[in-house]
């Protein structure tokens, strides 16, 4: 079995720093612990993304055991995996009906929205807005779609959320047993997701031609590390 040792080492390091942010750093500074926890939460989400594509073992099933519990508490790993892989299988990127990761709406649906909702979505379509309110907007929209699937009898989605509740409860139990206050961890989760919104905001802008919806993100430094240097997104 092929093992990508640098990636595996990064996974171990991510959990080690996350643990330090919970059990050690709050004794020095809660603000510092929140900042470090937020960075590790963002990094963990990037690692989950890598696992969906078969890293670090060359087979997704083994890698999933390392990242099944979502540290940001927002999205079940199973649902992230399924929708993300469906997104990559779709040639019509940004299509609001075909692309499960699209941030766009059908014009006919848009004109039927209340004015206040249009304002919120327009704000969400700026980088500052995506970082500030994007975690809430995307969570509400995603959970509404998921609830619809569950009501329609999708047992796979229901199982994914049931497992997510159990695993998230486990994460929160670890947080509750740590030095970091639970409220501080929830803030760290929000910041971590907000950081991820920087990348997803840049990916797949609407364009008349499909090839115009693929991006190359030129970046260096901390953000490049948190996004694991995945500069090409197709």
Q: Language-model features: where?
A:
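Hydrophobic alpha-helical membrane-insertion segments
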Residues: 58-59, 123, 173, 177, ...
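Juxtamembrane helix-capping/reentrant segments at transmembrane boundaries
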Residues: 55-75, 97-113, 210-224
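Acidic (Asp/Glu-rich) catalytic motifs at the cytosolic membrane interface
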Residues: 41-60, 80-93, 199, 203-206, ...
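Non-catalytic, topology-defining segments of multipass membrane proteins
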Residues: 1-43, 47, 70-186
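Short hydrophobic "helix-edge" motifs at membrane interfaces and signal-peptide entry regions
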Residues: 38-40, 65, 104-105, 193-195, ...
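Short hydrophobic/aromatic-rich motifs at helix boundaries and adjacent loops
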Residues: 52-57, 142-143, 168-170, 222-226
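Extended hydrophobic/aromatic segments used for targeting, binding, or gating
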Residues: 185-227
């Amino acid at each position: 079995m092929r093992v990508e040792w640098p990636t595996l080492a990064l996974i171990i390091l991510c959990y080690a720093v996350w643990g330090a942010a919970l059990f050690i750093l709050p004794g020095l500074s809660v603000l510092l612990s929140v900042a470090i926890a937020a960075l590790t939460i963002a990094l963990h989400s990037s690692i989950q993304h890598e696992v969906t594509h078969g890293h670090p073992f060359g087979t997704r099933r083994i890698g999933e055991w390392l990242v099944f519990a979502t540290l940001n508490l927002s999205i079940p790993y199973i649902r992230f995996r399924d929708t993300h892989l469906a997104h990559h299988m779709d040639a019509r990127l940004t299509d609001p009906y075909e692309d499960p990761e699209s941030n766009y709406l059908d014009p006919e649906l848009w004109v039927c929205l209340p004015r206040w909702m249009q304002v919120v979505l327009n704000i969400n379509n700026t980088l500052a807005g995506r970082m500030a309110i994007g975690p809430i907007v995307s969570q509400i929209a995603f959970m509404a779609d998921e609830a619809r699937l569950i009501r329609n009898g999708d047992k796979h989605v229901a199982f994914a959320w049931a497992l997510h509740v159990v695993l998230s409860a486990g994460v929160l139990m670890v947080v509750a047993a740590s030095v970091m206050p639970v409220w501080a961890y929830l803030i760290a989760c929000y910041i971590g997701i907000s950081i991820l919104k920087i990348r997803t905001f840049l990916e797949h802008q609407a364009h008349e031609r499909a090839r115009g919806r693929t991006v190359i993100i030129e970046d260096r430094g901390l953000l490049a590390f948190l996004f694991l240097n995945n500069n090409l997104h197709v």
